[in-house]
Amino acid sequence: METDQPKTVDENTENKPQENKGLVENSLPSEPSPTLEKAEAQQENKAATKGADDADKRSGVVTKPQKKPPVSDPEAVKIQAWWRGTLVRRTLLHAALRVWIIQAWWRVKLARLQDSRRRAALENFTRKEWAAVRLQSWVRMWRIRRRYCRLLDAARIIQAYWRCHSCTSRGFIKGYYRVTANQLHLELEILLGSGPCIVTECIPLPIKQ
């Protein structure tokens, strides 16, 4: 009995008219389009993310960034590592160049500062040296001039005494001569401080025959 009952049900279902199928299809709701489903899903995701962000902000909890899943491709990993190394080396090179430029500028600035200080010290030393030389020259000139004045005064005193002595001992010489046929008559009178002196002499002249 039990085995015969499902057969009768299946037979009855098979013998249903096709009109019932059309009615059932018309009564079912139409399926939504895929674009509408995507738009609705995006809106739901946005709303969910906004709600989560607002909740995090209110609660003060900072969400940690999700870690990216590891890449299984070794070639991509090598390229990424090479590119990161290139970027790091480039940044280090730029930093080293900036440091080198700053150090070069500071060395030039320090050299100029030292040069200006050395020049100022040299000028100060030359001024002091020149002032000392001028003072020494003035002192030497004053000493030499004083010595010269002393010698000049001594010479004037000696000359005055000598002139006085020569004036007291000064004499005059006067005389006359007379020439005859064979003689030269000479008579001199010398006046000295002590007294007059008269010299007379006859000089014979040689006569050729």
UniProtKB/Swiss-Prot annotation:
Main location: cytoplasm
Pfam family, one: IQ
Position of the signal peptide: none
Ranges of Basic and acidic residues composition bias in the record: 1-19
Subcellular location: Cytoplasmic vesicle, Secretory vesicle, Acrosome
GO biological process annotation, one example: positive regulation of acrosome reaction
Record domain IQ: where: 72-101, 128-157
Gene Ontology molecular-function annotations: calmodulin binding
SMART domains, per database record: IQ
The keyword Isomerase is annotated on this UniProt entry: no
Region (Disordered): 1-73
Gene3D superfamilies: 1.20.5.190
InterPro entries, sorted: IQ_motif_EF-hand-BS, IQCF, P-loop_NTPase
The keyword tRNA processing belongs to this UniProt entry's keyword annotation: no
Subunit structure, interactors included: Interacts with calmodulin.
PANTHER family: IQ DOMAIN-CONTAINING PROTEIN F1, IQ MOTIF CONTAINING F
Function: Involved in sperm capacitation and acrosome reaction.
Name of the protein: IQ domain-containing protein F1
Organism listed in the record: Bos taurus (Bovine)
